[in-house]
Amino acid sequence: YHNFFEHYGLSATRGFGIQLLTGKSIGGGTSINWQTSLETPTEVLNEWDQLTKQQDYFNSDVFKESIKHVVDNLGVTTEYNHIPLKEEKLAEGFEKNNISYRVIPKNNRSTHGMECGFCAFGCGYESRNSSYKIWLENGNFNGNIYSDTGIQKIIINNDKATHIEVENNGTASRIEVERVILAGGSLNTPRILLNSGYKNPQLGKNLKTHPVSGVAAKFNEQQQPWYGSMQGMHSEDFLFKTNNYGYLLQGLPMHPSIFFPYFPNFVSSAEDFIESYNHWSGAIVLTSDTS
């Protein structure tokens, strides 16, 4: 957790209203994820065009070709995925309620290691097509990468970035730079800019999240909630209920170290949960909030 996740996987909003499971490894969400790789729906692209007044930029051939380039290079496919044992009850429930579902596309290159079930902690089988493996290992990157190094602030002199202050394994240093491209994500980019002295009142105030709720149940049959494909299938039947807003239903891997922090109501019955762990299965409901 200390190597791959922000704040050991326990990042949260002020007041702990929403917990944020965010990665920090090289390769980003293509390296530390559940391998679920979904293209942005046309309905959302239409909404982005409307909100940004970009005159069909997000629906343009150029943008769609860029998405296709990424998808193709990451090898996103359903070929190496299937519904694992832990999601069979969910699929059964969908069928009984006439809810359609489909196998989730993933960015893995083969079935090797697919049943491991620990993809969220890094792939020990090198079977994941992360951006690190695709673009960096193939010689498409000309430069140096410094892992375990966090940028604290940018030093500005005469309206120009001249240095960055970084910390590596507890050691702080200042590095001279010619230019800076800041790509710290929606959580860290505002923080770095604020630390650097930027005064824009909008910095850090417009983050939108898509809240996730979870359900879990204990069954008589063994479920192996830690094993197999991290996520095998999902349902989009309720994704666009009203004006593009609704919810997405997906299976849930239930490793205790991930499960307990995000399902605090189970803590009081932790002993029973651990003793009967092999008989539990769960699902998540991803709410579509403002884009």
List each model region and its residues.
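Short alpha-helical segments and helix-capping/turn motifs at coil-helix boundaries
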Residues: F16-Q19, K86-E88, K133, N168, ...
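A general structural signal for short secondary-structure junctions and capping/turn motifs
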Residues: T22-K24, E92-G93, E137-N138, A172-R174, ...
